[in-house]
Amino acid sequence: MTPKQSPNSETGAVTEPPLVLVTGPSGAGRTTAINVLEDLDFEAIDNLPLRLVPALVAAGGADRALVLGLDPRNRDFSTEAMVDMIDMLKARRGLKTTVLYLDADAEILLRRFSETRRRHPLSPAESPELGVSRELDLMQPVKERSDVVIDTSDLNVHQLRAEVERLFAPSGRRLAVSLHSFSYKRGIPRNVDMVFDCRFLSNPYWEPALRVHDGRDQEVQDYVMSDARFQGFFDRVLDLTLSLLPAYREEGKSHFSIAFGCTGGQHRSVTLAETLAKALAREGQQVSIRHRELPGQQLK
């Protein structure tokens, strides 16, 4: 997740329900994000032609927040028209407009299309690679105008739901913390604030009885925690986390993410994420966990 500056250019008081525009390339999770916002009591309208948006907003009279799904596949879509519309809405006094852009790497979008066996809407008679490339180029100026960009390349539907809820759920919730485990072989996860390398700890992978298990299992956790270096490392991580959370909360941050990495992303990093989650929960902290290398679901 990449938040940018305040979504509205004007400084007047907000007098209308918030407006969220959700867009992004096909296959990046736009529909999922809209569904989450609808569950949060937003009035949702998907695939609205661009020419109808200004009139809808000008009509006013809404009694709850509105989310509009803007699809680059629409017949009247043009990058210039959408950028102009975004600028117009952000300049409207009394209206808080937020542009949420769902993004993903080209190879991930291609994989999602191949898994669903769908043709790409911008190249129905040509290769999907060409369609993905065209759409990413087409949407780049819109991405640059967006207030929040969520890269869903490494997210499944549940993790995207959690991200959207943290951003748009009603105010008053606690600062949400998400903990991640990962394998360095696949690179550091996107959208994380702090990363810890756990590869110095004893590796359960080399124990045949533990290799088939993961860090959610007690026997693996016991093995990792038996390393004399574990407790000192964990205590420092916990102290650092607990000292940072109030500062981030005061700054208005709604979400803080911490990632633990090891060689395979199955044992040590999972153990650290699970152990920290339990410790933070005992402090009354809202926590979610994501183990990237363990099985998950794909976005649609």
Swiss-Prot record:
Pfam families: PapZ_C (PF22740), RapZ-like_N (PF03668)
Keywords recorded for this protein, A-Z: ATP-binding, GTP-binding, Nucleotide-binding
Residues reported to bind GTP: D71, P72, R73, N74
InterPro entries per record: P-loop_NTPase, RapZ-like, RapZ-like_N, RapZ_C
Residues involved in ATP binding: G24, P25, S26, G27, A28, G29, R30, T31
Source superkingdom: Bacteria
tRNA processing recorded as keyword: no
GO terms for MF: ATP binding; GTP binding
Family: Belongs to the RapZ-like family.
HAMAP family linked to this entry: RapZ_like (MF_00636)
Protein's job: Displays ATPase and GTPase activities.
NCBIfam families: PRK05416.1 (NF003828)
Protein name, UniProt field: Nucleotide-binding protein TM1040_2438
Organism annotation: Ruegeria sp. (strain TM1040)
